């Protein structure tokens, strides 16, 4: 349903954001 789609999109965005933050903090990209 729509909520599942939104949840998936939000999760993907959060994971991408965390990856970028971790990349900057630890220098492991």
Curated annotation (Swiss-Prot):
<protein>
    <recommendedName>
        <fullName>Brevinin-2Re</fullName>
    </recommendedName>
</protein>
<dbReference type="GO" id="GO:0006952">
    <property type="term" value="P:defense response"/>
</dbReference>
<keyword id="KW-0964">Secreted</keyword>
<keyword id="KW-1015">Disulfide bond</keyword>
<dbReference type="InterPro" id="IPR012521">
    <property type="entry name" value="Antimicrobial_frog_2"/>
</dbReference>
<comment type="function">
    <text>Antimicrobial peptide.</text>
</comment>
<feature type="disulfide bond">
    <location>
        <begin position="23"/>
        <end position="29"/>
    </location>
</feature>
<dbReference type="GO" id="GO:0005576">
    <property type="term" value="C:extracellular region"/>
</dbReference>
<keyword id="KW-0929">Antimicrobial</keyword>
<dbReference type="Pfam" id="PF08023">
    <property type="entry name" value="Antimicrobial_2"/>
</dbReference>
<comment type="similarity">
    <text>Belongs to the frog skin active peptide (FSAP) family. Brevinin subfamily.</text>
</comment>
